[in-house]
């Protein structure tokens, strides 16, 4: 036979704590847009899905917490310390290595880790050297600088030319630019009855309608009442 305490615990309204399946609770269910829902990969995170679809999670720059892009690999020379080398030569190598590392801008590299000329500003160049310091290739910048006097629409068109769009983005743009019929707001049943009472009592005298405290409870102005009465007349074919 159970003790008094156990019987009280069994009758208590407080439920026993149980584990829950967090993955099922936090699973994203895309319902807003059919194109995004069709191409959404539930095995990836939100940021990874947006990057794959060609969208942006945030319009500005991230302050941190971004996933490292492992496709861009920068080869670094292994530093070999020799007991017979001079201190001055070592310092020169260290400073030169630091300068080379600082000069590399990750935003100017492509997926293969090579310089992309379309990402380098026009009038600048980037030099690629081999292990001995000899020049292998020179990348000349082709990205044009932004003109301050340029029109906003013209600037937007220029950015759209340089921007590489995914198939999902193209479908979304076509979906957004489709012609949509404008749906006008109709009168509700109660609003129709209220306008009918106003018209039967005051006719076309909108000033009296405005000062009618019993019918015009929300103190709608003469112009608002006029527009609503004209709409009501058109609906009921009243001249």
Curated annotation (Swiss-Prot):
InterPro entries noted in UniProt: Ribosome_biogenesis_Nop16
Biased composition (Acidic residues): 85-115
rRNA processing in keyword set: yes
Top-level taxon of the source organism: Eukaryota
Keyword Ribonucleoprotein: yes
Key words, A-Z: Nucleus, Ribonucleoprotein, Ribosome biogenesis, rRNA processing
Subcellular location: Nucleus, Nucleolus
Chief location of this protein within or outside the cell: nucleus
Transmembrane segments: none
An annotated GO cellular component: ribonucleoprotein complex
One Pfam family per UniProt: Nop16
UniProt feature, compositional bias: Basic residues: 1-23
Region listing for Disordered, in residue ranges: 1-31, 81-124
Gene Ontology BP annotations: ribosomal large subunit biogenesis; rRNA processing
Function, as annotated: Involved in the biogenesis of the 60S ribosomal subunit.
Subunit structure: Component of the pre-66S ribosomal particle.
UniProt family annotation: Belongs to the NOP16 family.
Designated name of the protein: Nucleolar protein 16
UniProt organism field: Kluyveromyces lactis (strain ATCC 8585 / CBS 2359 / DSM 70799 / NBRC 1267 / NRRL Y-1140 / WM37) (Yeast)
């Amino acid at each position: 036979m159970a003790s008094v305490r156990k019987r009280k615990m069994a009758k208590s309204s407080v439920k026993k704590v149980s584990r829950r399946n967090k993955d099922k609770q936090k699973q994203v269910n895309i319902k807003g847009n059919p194109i995004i829902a069709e191409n959404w990969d539930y095995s990836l995170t939100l940021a990874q899905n947006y990057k794959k679809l060609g969208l942006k999670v945030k319009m500005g720059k991230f302050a941190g917490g971004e996933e490292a892009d492992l496709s861009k690999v920068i080869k670094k020379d292994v530093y070999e310390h020799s007991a017979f080398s001079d201190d001055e030569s070592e310092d020169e190598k260290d400073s030169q290595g630091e300068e080379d590392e600082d000069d590399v801008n990750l935003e100017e590299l492509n997926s293969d880790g090579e310089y992309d000329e379309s990402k380098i500003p026009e009038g600048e160049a980037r030099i690629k050297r081999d292990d001995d310091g000899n020049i292998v290739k020179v990348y000349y910048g082709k990205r044009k600088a932004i003109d301050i006097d340029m029109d906003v629409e013209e600037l937007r068109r220029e950015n759209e030319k340089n921007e590489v769009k995914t198939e999902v983005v193209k479908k979304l743009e076509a979906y957004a630019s489709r012609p949509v019929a404008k749906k006008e707001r109709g009168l509700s049943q109660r609003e129709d009855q209220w306008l009918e009472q106003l018209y039967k009592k005051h006719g076309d005298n909108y000033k009296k309608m405005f000062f009618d405290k019993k019918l015009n409870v929300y103190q709608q102005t003469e112009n608002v009442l006029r527009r609503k009465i004209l709409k009501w007349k058109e609906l009921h074919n009243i001249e």
